[in-house]
Structures are given as structure tokens and as C-alpha cells.
Design a protein with these regions (language model features):
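Conserved N-terminal phosphate-binding loop of PLP-dependent enzymes in the Aspartate aminotransferase
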Residues: 1-375
């Protein structure tokens, strides 16, 4: 791999790194992977390949949940950051900058139909979801948020309440009067949740990622959007893991025939080079920005370095050759997955759209775990 040696920061080997991680960082997460037989400490990384610090190479099919869509350490994006560092830093979030204005304009222009009006920047997806929820509550004067059971929209203050009970209970974040959860692809359950006309917004990943990438049933998302309009709620499309060209279209919701009121993006927006997130709002959702622009502040939100990197990421993603490459991968994966389904009876279902894929196996966890270890 053509990249610099990975810094060890004084540790002699992997065992020392893992011991320090247990002691000073996260004992449960460290031991989880070790006990599963995956004692991975990522060292060198480039393109779609990464190395354990012991030298074993892996094809990175996880990509940190869609963070490295254009590959680890994409040379064009690295050069963009280096160039920006010669002239700017994170800047001051209180004042307008050319980079922030340019990125906001570029993001608004990615959403079809000229429907979006403003962009609020942050540094991670959870923060962007928090902004989306606050915007919807201000716009509607309502408090209740509806999400999908087993969803994951982040782990910050408001976003965690939209997700798995496992984390809500741990941090005493359950708020059943404010946050409701319904099964994915169950339009009747969604209608019941909205029928009280007290919901500020429905938030959905276009394809729920940590839920195993179940595909939306034909027409389901359009029906949800129609219910939102009927009952006065906003529709928040969480495209943190499904957007930025991963399903051929720039945003996954485009080929489901919907126009969200709010779009959330992060992760791959900077291809893993500099943290940045964005909450894209239509004019209704952006009303609070006219009343009190200081109502949400983030020191590193829309940093000048992050904006430079994100602009380059969008430019590369929208190139014709990038789009054609994703189309070709979509066709290739469809063919190969069909062959795998025919060849391996333990594989019962493939959930696939563009470069996104989830594989369902017979039984509970064991076949899937065994498959992952073989990789």
C-alpha cells in the first residue's frame, strides 16, 4: 500500500494497543470484537483496502457506514484539505464565509425540484438529526417524533430517542410521550401514529442501515410522505448512510418519488477526511433561522476546512464517470448476488440497491457470524 506507516504512539504491538484501549477508552467494545475473533486494530488504509497493524489486509466492505464512499484517503480530497490548511482553519461559526455559503448552495442544488431553502451545519450525523428535530418542532409547534423500530439516527441528545430501546433505557432517555416507534413497511401502523395530528415529524432512513437494510416496499415511502402532508407533519429523510451517490441517484429518496421537507447528511460528506454534517431544510422547516439564527450553534459546524473537503466530495460524486461506475457496480452486484442465492441455500435473501447490500441467512445469528468470520 502506498501510504505512510501508521503511527503507534509509543505502543510496542497490537496487544499493548488493545490493553490501553480497555483501560482508557472502551472496555466493552474492545472485548466484544476480541471475543468474536476479530481483534482488529486498523493501521494503514488506502482506497478500499485497510490493514491490521499486524499487516493482514482486508477489503473494507463496511466503510464505516458509508463514510469512505470514495475510498480511504482519496488523493483528490486529501490534496483539497492540504491546500485549505495552507490558507484557513476551522474559522468562526458566527460569521459568514465563502466556503460555508458555497457548500450550502451546492447541497440545496443536489435536491431535485428546487424545494430546499437553507442549510444548517454540524460535525456529525447525530447533531444533524437533532437540528432536524428542533426545526420540525419549531415549524409545526408540535413535539412528537415518529421513527422506525430498531432505527439508528445517532446517539446525541434528541437523536438517541428515535432509536433502539437498548440505548434509551441505558441513559434513561425513553420519552414515550414525545417519541413513537412503528414497524418499517407497516403503513397502517404509521397512519395510526399520525392520526392524532400531534406529530411534528416522521424521520426515516430511506433504507434502514443498522436494521439490516430492509428495502422499502413499492410505494411505501410515498405513502408515508402523503400521510405526513395529510396530518401536518414534516418528513425527515435521514440520508447519512444511503445518500451521496451510493444508490446511483445522489439521494436514495429520489427513486422513491418523494420530496422530503428535511434531508440529513454526514459521514461520506467529507469522505472521512474531516468531520462535517448538514441538515438541509425547506423554507417551512427553516423558519427559525429568520427569527433567531443563534438558536442552534456548533463551534465546528460548517468549519472552513470541512466545507472545502465537502465541496470536493460533492464534485467528485456528481461526475459522470462516478455515476456510471456506481451503475456498473449495481448491475454486477445484482448478477453475483443472484448466483450466490442459487448456490448457497443458507443465504435466503439479498437486500440490494446500488452499492448498498444486506444478506439474510437461515436461522438466527450463527450463519451470518460464521460468514463474516470467513471474510
Amino acid at each position: 500500500m502506498n501510504c505512510n506507516d501508521y503511527p503507534m504512539y509509543g505502543f510496542a504491538d497490537k496487544a499493548e494497543v488493545l490493553d490501553a484501549a480497555r483501560k482508557y477508552w472502551n472496555p466493552d467494545k474492545t472485548d466484544f470484537w476480541v471475543n468474536e475473533g476479530i481483534p482488529l486494530v486498523i493501521g494503514k488504509r488506502e482506497g478500499y483496502v485497510l490493514e491490521d497493524i499486524d499487516g493482514k489486509s482486508f477489503i473494507d466492505m463496511h466503510l464505516n457506514g458509508g463514510t469512505f464512499n470514495l475510498g480511504h484517503r482519496n488523493p483528490e480530497i486529501v490534496d483539497t484539505l492540504k491546500d485549505a490548511l495552507e490558507r484557513v482553519d476551522v474559522g468562526n461559526h458566527h460569521f459568514a464565509t465563502s466556503g460555508r455559503a458555497a457548500l450550502a448552495k451546492a447541497l440545496i442544488e443536489t435536491v431535485p425540484g428546487n424545494t430546499m431553502g437553507k442549510v444548517v451545519f454540524g460535525s456529525c450525523g447525530g447533531e444533524a438529526v437533532d437540528v432536524a428535530i428542533k426545526s420540525a418542532r419549531f415549524a409545526t409547534g408540535r413535539k412528537k417524533i415518529v421513527s422506525v423500530i430498531k432505527a439508528c439516527h445517532g446517539h446525541t441528545g434528541l437523536s438517541i430517542a428515535t432509536g433502539d430501546d437498548r440505548f434509551l433505557k441505558m441513559f434513561n432517555c425513553s420519552r414515550p410521550d414525545e417519541f413513537a416507534h412503528v414497524p418499517f413497511n407497516d403503513i397502517d401502523a404509521m397512519e395510526r401514529a399520525l392520526s392524532g395530528n400531534d406529530v411534528a415529524a416522521v424521520i426515516m432512513e430511506t433504507i434502514p442501515a443498522t436494521y439490516g437494510f430492509p428495502m422499502p416496499a413499492p410505494g411505501y415511502l410515498a405513502q408515508v410522505k402523503a400521510l405526513c402532508e395529510k396530518h401536518g407533519a414534516l418528513y425527515i429523510a435521514d440520508e447519512v448512510q444511503t445518500g451521496l451517490g451510493r444508490t446511483v441517484d445522489f439521494w436514495c429518496f429520489e427513486h422513491h418519488g418523494i420530496t422530503p421537507d428535511i434531508v440529513v447528511t454526514s459521514k461520506g460528506l467529507s469522505d472521512g477526511i474531516y468531520p462535517i454534517s448538514a441538515t438541509i431544510l425547506n423554507e417551512r422547516a427553516a423558519k427559525w433561522l429568520y427569527e433567531d439564527g443563534f438558536a442552534h450553534m456548533a463551534t465546528f459546524g460548517g468549519s472552513e476546512l470541512g466545507c472545502a473537503v465537502a465541496l470536493k466530495t460533492i464534485e467528485i460524486t456528481r461526475r459522470a464517470e462516478t455515476v456510471e461506475h456506481v451503475k456498473a457496480l449495481d448491475v454486477l452486484y445484482s448478477k453475483r448476488f443472484a448466483e450466490l442465492l442459487e448456490k448457497h441455500p443458507s443465504l435466503t435473501e439479498v437486500r440490494h440497491d446500488g452499492t448498498i447490500a444486506g444478506l439474510k441467512f437461515q436461522g438466527e445469528d450463527e450463519p451470518a457470524v460464521r460468514f463474516c468470520k470467513l471474510l
